Amino acid sequence: QRKGIHAEVENGEFLGLYRTKYILDEKPLISIIIPNKDHIDDLDRCVQSILKKSAYPNYEFVIVENNSTEDETFAYYEKLQKECEKVHVCRYEGPFNYSKINNFGVSHAAGEYLLLLNNDTEMINEDCLEEMLGYCSRSDVGAVGARLYYEDNTIQHAGVVIGFGGIAGHCFVQQKRGTTGYCLRIICAQDYSAVTAACMMVKRSVFEEVGGLTEELAVAFNDIDFCMKVRQKGYLIVYNPYAELYHYESKSRGLEDTPEKLERFHNEIRIFETRWPEIMKNGDPYYNPNLSIVRGDCAFRM
């Protein structure tokens, strides 16, 4: 009340830990942008998990078709659009470029809020959209990420630290579900320098203000770069552990396992380092410099 924030504060799982639940006075439209190439089993699991589980009613799907080759894929699109008026399919014709595909999807979206979502994800909790929207609706917040799990119920994403692996990486990877992490960071809502766009909500106004995703970064680091641009404009990047999904990771795109893909990857490293030299030199402001950037579990530097 003192801060004029419409929210309730609950006791968390442990003494001294609190959970803020934002009360949504309105139900703005959320456009869920999902790039897709074939793999309709993954896409259907993603879409159906939201349709069946989400308690939040006002959303649309913008599925961005990119270079599918299987007839079953297009038959599925047609069937899904007939069965569900929330679904819209648009076609991006060009080689895979994650940034261009999502920017294209946003141009076909009607929502005040955007949820960039990979097709190989699956919503777990019914209040996932409300949880992300609650933080994203704050005037000082630009983007919100979620807690993501691998299929074996270990952590895939709980925030991103600049410097991990030489450039940037996810925190607490492969720690067991239910683990709290260093200083309870896995289970605390908090600010980070970046979150993954495998599931990232952003205000449309902020997305447009920063010019969307940087299209020079076709595959790697485009989400980290986007978060850097958002922070540069003075907005916060929030990790919300109470929005939970599975992420089966890069099933449709495949691995970085060819000379061409490796060359592109190293070029994108150079682009990112050139664009953000200060944070690469000084380190992540949301990470203790006494902790390891070799390991992702916040162990002490040795």
PLM ranges: what are they?
Residues Q1-I30, D152, F164-D191, I237, ...:
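C-terminal, non-catalytic tails of nucleotide-sugar-dependent glycosyltransferases
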Residues I30-D42, C46-S49, K53-S54, V64-N66, ...:
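A conserved hydrophobic helix/loop-capping motif in glycosyltransferases and polysaccharide synthases
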Residues T121-I167:
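Conserved donor NDP-sugar-binding/catalytic core segment of glycosyltransferases
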Residues P28-I33, E60, D225:
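Cell-envelope/extracellular polymer assembly enzymes that use nucleotide-activated donors
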Residues L114:
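Short aromatic/hydrophobic "clamp" motif used to bind/position activated sugar donors
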Residues Q1, C128-M132, I186-G211, E216-Y246:
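A short, conserved alpha-helix in the catalytic core of glycosyltransferases
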Residues Y92-A109:
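Glycine-rich, basic loop-to-helix element that forms the pyrophosphate-binding segment
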Residues L51-R91:
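Acidic donor-binding segment of Leloir-type glycosyltransferases
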